Amino acid sequence: NRRRFIKECKERGQRPGIYWTPFVDWGGNMNKDVEGTNGKYKYGDIVLKINGQPAQFPGGNKGWALDPTHIGTKMRIDYYIDQWIKDGYEFLKIDFMTHGTFEADSWYDPEVTTGIQAYNQGMKYLSDRIGDKMYVNLSIAPLFPAQYANGRRFACDTYGTMNDTKYALNALTHSW
């Protein structure tokens, strides 16, 4: 239960946080209703298309890129952010942000002509919705624009091998 988790975190002097990917759908069901849209939009309506096909990140993670300019994506943002703020979350790690920068056939907003323009619009919307109610940390995000978050992860995941340790230390020192 989320609310019990949040309460317990705060009782221990910790700040509760949650993880999300606002511009990615991991399910791949293009006929599924988008959360927060009351059935008005399906994932097939809000997914970006490249050469007419739903856009996925190359390499096998299978996340489908969502159009940051689409009203359905923005309604989904409202649905989750409003719920999490009401619940008492204070930290939000948002990941796989590069999906929001994909170059696509087109975007919902016809004024948008590049992936970075779409990303800027979606991130401004998300940032404005959150306001100062949560600390936001970006992962797998473009270095610039950087104004939409309080922090960012500076390297990818590491594990227990010596090569991972070298990678983490190299990232920590910015390749010095």
Describe the role of every protein-language-model region.
Residues 33-71, 75, 121-176:
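Glycan-recognition surfaces
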Residues 21, 27-34, 104, 147-148:
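Short, solvent-exposed loop/turn and secondary-structure capping segments
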Residues 21-25, 97-99, 139-143:
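Active-site beta-loop-alpha junctions enriched in small/polar residues
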